[in-house]
Design a protein with these regions (language model features):
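Long, charged amphipathic helices and adjacent flexible linkers at domain junctions
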Residues: 36-73, 188-198
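Phosphate-interacting basic helix/loop segments used at nucleotide- and nucleic-acid interfaces
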Residues: 68-82, 141-152, 158
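Glycine-rich phosphate-binding active-site loops on the catalytic face of alpha/beta enzymes
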Residues: 9-30
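Flexible, glycine/charged-enriched surface loops at secondary-structure junctions
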Residues: 21, 27, 46-56, 83, ...
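Short, small-residue-biased leader/transition segments that mark boundaries at the very start
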Residues: 1-8
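Nucleotide-binding motor/catalytic cores of P-loop/tubulin-like NTPases across gene-expression machines
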Residues: 94-96, 102-140
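C-terminal helical cap(s) of enzyme catalytic domains, especially alpha/beta-barrels
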Residues: 24-46, 173-179
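C-terminal binding/interaction regions
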Residues: 146, 155-163, 167-168, 173-185
Length: 199
């Protein structure tokens, strides 16, 4: 029971993932134990209390642009009507940075690699989605928006934050905030030919 009590407490402190102890999992009622912990975790997600947040300060001397932008994106969800934060991801680093700040709305990580998608499955608040890379980075973002709309993860009137880099293979360098339908309305004007990213 002690392991289960710890899982419950950890749920309220917004842990990334839960793992039942061997004793619980191999006990008389392993399926019931998993079902119960699933219910508890789901309820804990609904009952989020700001007091349970563990503050993650940024070092004043840090030059970590990704962490800075991730924190600002999560902060923006408390000031604006942002319903999701989208990031495209090779390694999952930006999505994990976003998860660290424990935002209220989901992080939709559009992953270039299936392996990255699997790794992000354990990150708090991250919904990892695999989508093969396109030649044009801007078109990748617009294709992701269309897919998220089609799957019902976003609505046309939703405001979203988007974190990405200006150049493939470099760290996150910008945060863009748009209403989905407005971004898509101007997609054809925004996509530059032979452009890997925005720069």
């Amino acid at each position: 029971l002690v392991g289960s009590e710890m899982c419950i407490r950890d749920s309220y402190y917004r842990t990334d993932a839960l793992m039942l102890s061997g004793e619980t999992a191999y006990g008389k009622y392993p399926v019931e134990a998993v079902k119960t912990m699933t219910k508890v975790a789901a309820q804990a997600e609904k009952d989020k209390l700001p007091d349970n947040d563990i503050r993650i300060p940024l070092d004043e001397n840090s030059n970590d642009v990704t962490a800075f932008l991730a924190k600002q994106a999560v902060k923006a969800t408390t000031k604006l009507k942002i319903r999701a934060i989208i990031t495209d991801s090779y390694s999952g680093r930006t999505a994990r940075n976003l998860a660290a700040f424990r935002g209220k709305y989901p992080v939709l990580a559009i992953c270039y690699k299936e392996k990255t998608m699997r790794h992000l499955a354990l990150s708090y608040g991250v919904e990892a989605i695999y989508m093969p890379e396109l030649a044009n980075g801007q078109e990748y973002y617009f294709a992701a928006l269309r897919r998220l709309l089609q799957e019902g993860r976003l609505q046309p009137t939703d405001m979203v934050g988007y974190l990405s880099s200006g150049k493939a293979g470099t760290q996150t360098s910008f945060l863009e905030i748009n209403v989905v339908e407005d971004a898509l309305k101007h997609a054809n004007e925004s996509v530059l030919p032979n452009c890997n990213r925005y720069l």
